[in-house]
Structure formats: C-alpha cells, structure tokens
Amino acid sequence: MKHLIHYFFRKSLIIAIVFMLTMMQLTAQTDSIANLPQYLFPNFDTSIVRLKTGELFKAVMNYNTLTERMAFYQKGTLLDLVKTETIDTICIQNRLFVPFERSFYEVILNAPVAFFIQHKSDLISTGRPAALGTTSQTVGITSVSKLVGTRNSYNFKLSENFKIKPYEVYWVRMNNEMHKFLNENQLLKIFTAKKHEIKIFINQFNLKVNKTEDLVKLASFCNELFR
C-alpha cells in the first residue's frame, strides 16, 4: 500500500512539474513578443473571433499595424489570419474589429453612419552610419510588400536598422459608401449638408477627430443629425 501511495505521489509530482515547466515556457514565449512596436496592443491577448456562420472561438491575437494583418499565436508560432472573408468580427481587449479586404478596421460606432479607424504604420530606415558618427536616412520609408514573404517575419522583433511610425486613417460608412478622412476639414467635406452644425458641435466641446473618445462623441452626433 505504501509503495502504491508513493507511486501515485511521484506521478502527481511529475505531472505538476511538467505543467509548471510548460506554463513557464509559454510565458517566456509570449513575453518574447510583448511590446513590439508594430503591434497595436502591448501584448498578445485572448480574443473572441466570430465567424460569419455565427460560430465563436478564442485565439491569442494582436493586430500588426505594419502589415495590417491579424496575427495569432498558436503552439509557439506566430501566424497571420488570412481567410478574412470568413470573419464577422474580432474582439481584442474589448475593442471590436471588422475585416476590410485583407486588413481589419476598428469599429468606433456601428450605426447607419458608421465610423472606423484603420490602424497603420510605416517602416522607417534609421539609416546607415555616415561620417563623423552621423546617420544617413536617405532610405526613408520601406515598402513592406517587398519584404514580407509567405512567412511573415514582420510579426517578430524588427532589426535595429528600422523603426515604426504609427498613424491612423479614419473612415465613415454612409449609404453603403466608404469615405476616408485624416482631419477635421476632410470630415466636414463628407457631410457638406450638415457641416455647419458639425463645426459648431466640434468647437463647442473642443473635439479632436484624432482622439478616439472625441470621435465617439462626434459619431453619435452625426447619427442624430441624419436620423
């Protein structure tokens, strides 16, 4: 009996140690892809994916602003989500994303006048060493499409010769048409019939279209105007 108890104790201990080592390895692997500048979120996080069939599943995901692809972490490997036509929505850290062609836009307000943010970034060469310790930046912005192959190396840590410059593009969907804007003036041109009222609202509350919380207020106001 004592031998049996000792056997089960040793077996339980081995299982516990293997489990702990597995968790430590997983943590180390996810830590290695934390705080990478090309990603929208600091960490890969458990996300909810809804398919167009209504099926739900979970995946550890983040959004790569450089390639404009959803990246997911599976069995120690980073992969791109390529079958975007099957996706309805993805929820990451309580923020909702919908597919547009092969990329994803963040939903600011899903309404008759819908607002979205397209999160992007440029890959900037930091240059090569020049005379007297200076740096040459003549290379400038690099086309990612020329650099990314079937296995996307830009899901991982980038070379020190490059840096990421993030920016946003804003979209309005109205009457099933998408309209792009980058600033307040471009937004007002989309709503020519109501631009006076929108301008007053922006000035009254000192809103900035490049601040998400302000854009939510502005989106709600625009929907009230077009009821």
Stretches with model-predicted labels:
Residues 57-179:
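Aromatic-patch recognition
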Residues 188-227:
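Long, compositionally biased interface segments
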Residues 1-32, 218:
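Bacterial Sec-dependent N-terminal signal peptides
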Residues 52-54:
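Glycine-centered tight beta-turn/hairpin loop motif at sheet-sheet or coil-to-beta transitions
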Residues 30-46:
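Short N-terminal segments immediately surrounding and downstream of signal-peptide cleavage
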Residues 167-199:
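Flexible, solvent-exposed short loops/turns enriched in glycine
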